[in-house]
């Protein structure tokens, strides 16, 4: 890489067009998607397991990771990228790719040992909303689950309005087991 940087510096001294040439080279590289996807995957709380005490492997999490890498490499429009992750199963002509994109909602830490299925559902929704707020609004929504803050723009009523939408999303597999339905 350092050799490439040196070569770019030399080429740039000769011609300002070098910037455009090198930018195009970098953006058409398959490594472009890998590099920038890692930032999105951090925000989306990507991991190959659910973390926490159980640390159960998410056998198909890689599909979501590959979806994100491919989306960056294909220069997928941001609005489409977001819609597919939040409702890829509901878009017209939903495909395997758009359904895999909903892995965004499946990822993240979950206490799968929680014996109370309804509490587990609500905790998952809380985690999804908190991630949604941090990802798309740049703010935490978690506090509004319990109370209003004097200076926060999200009130409890707003929180539970959003939670109602996510409550209709099936993220729990077999209700008697309490296990996450892995996509």
Feature names for model-found ranges:
Residues 1-183:
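Short, structured secondary-structure elements
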């Amino acid at each position: 890489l350092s050799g490439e940087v040196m070569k770019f510096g030399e080429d740039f001294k000769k011609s300002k067009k070098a910037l455009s040439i090198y930018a195009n080279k970098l953006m058409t590289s398959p490594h472009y998607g890998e590099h920038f996807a890692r930032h999105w995957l951090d925000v989306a709380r990507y991991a190959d397991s659910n973390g926490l005490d159980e640390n159960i492997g998410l056998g198909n999490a890689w599909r979501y990771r590959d979806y994100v890498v491919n989306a960056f490499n294909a220069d997928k429009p941001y609005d489409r990228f977001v819609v597919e992750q939040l409702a890829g199963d509901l878009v017209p002509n939903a495909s395997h790719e758009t359904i895999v994109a909903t892995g965004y909602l499946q990822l993240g830490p979950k206490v799968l040992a929680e014996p109370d299925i309804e509490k587990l559902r609500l905790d998952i929704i809380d985690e999804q909303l908190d991630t949604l707020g941090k990802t798309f609004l740049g703010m935490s929504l978690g506090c509004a689950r319990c109370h209003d803050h004097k200076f926060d723009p999200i009130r409890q009523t707003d929180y539970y309005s959003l939670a109602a939408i996510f409550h209709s999303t099936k993220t729990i597999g077999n209700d008697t087991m309490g296990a996450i339905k892995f996509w």
